[in-house]
Amino acid sequence: MEPKLRYTAVEKGDINLIDAYSTDAELKQYDMVVLKDNKHVFPPYQGAPMFKEKFLKEHPEIKKALNQLSNKITDEQMQEMNYKVTVKNEDPYKVAKQYLEKEGLAH
């Protein structure tokens, strides 16, 4: 089922349980409880930047900058940023910049 449809069905009371990404803004929006996956049925989701090799050769500084984010953003932080952008309609650039400044990765 399309992710947005899942949350619409939850909101309407049509369903009570869904599978979701732990970084979904809607988990916070609908005050949902996330069950622990103690059987590890769902693999961890970790976003990763992908570039064409040519681009990285032309902009080698990007690789170093992005590597500073490796294993830095928690699911809770990503969920909060997604919530600010998706639900509160905050500017994605500003939300990302605030995070980077808070973590000492941008000035």
Spans of model-derived segments:
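Short helix-initiation/N-cap motifs at beta->coil->alpha
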Residues: 1-8
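Alpha-to-beta junction loops
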Residues: 11-20
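Active-site lining segments that contact anionic ligands and/or coordinate catalytic metals
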Residues: 20, 29, 44-46
